């Protein structure tokens, strides 16, 4: 799946850290809104709060957070496959009763940085990329 995103769809693979600081979590809106759903990591003698990533999106979007990107350097497309960590202590997922919820799961994340005028076009492109992956997965033979 990653090979397809990289070679066919021209995404740049990023291997993000699984532990991020509080500033990074605020930068993507995970804090304070979803604080109760986060796994905070305690380090000896450290005053800085650290968290396990709830999604690779947190790291991928922070790659450009404090940047002014020249229009000629757009678009930027990132892909990452990571474990994600969430407590899901709040009401998120309340409408999925009966489903088994996990605190750790794996996910492939796509992030595109484009000009505002090209956002809808890029969203459509991302949807097509995801659809192509799903079609490839449907061709896999089930073996037991």
Task: Locate the predicted segments by residue.
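TRNA-recognition modules of translation machinery and tRNA-sensing kinases, especially anticodon-binding
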Residues: 1-144
């Amino acid at each position: 799946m990653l090979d397809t995103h990289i070679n066919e769809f021209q995404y740049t693979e990023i291997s993000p850290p699984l532990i991020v600081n509080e500033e990074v979590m605020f930068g993507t809106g995970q804090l304070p809104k979803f604080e109760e759903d986060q796994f905070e990591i305690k380090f000896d003698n450290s005053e800085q709060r650290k968290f396990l990533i709830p999604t690779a999106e947190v790291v991928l979007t922070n790659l450009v957070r404090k940047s002014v990107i020249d229009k000629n350097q757009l678009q930027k497309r990132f892909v990452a496959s990571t474990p994600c960590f969430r407590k899901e202590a709040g009401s998120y997922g309340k409408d999925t009763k009966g489903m088994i919820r996990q605190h750790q799961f794996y996910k492939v994340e796509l992030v595109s940085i484009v000009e505002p005028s090209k956002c809808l076009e890029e969203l459509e492109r991302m949807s097509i990329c995801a659809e192509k992956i799903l079609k490839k997965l449907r061709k896999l033979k089930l073996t037991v």
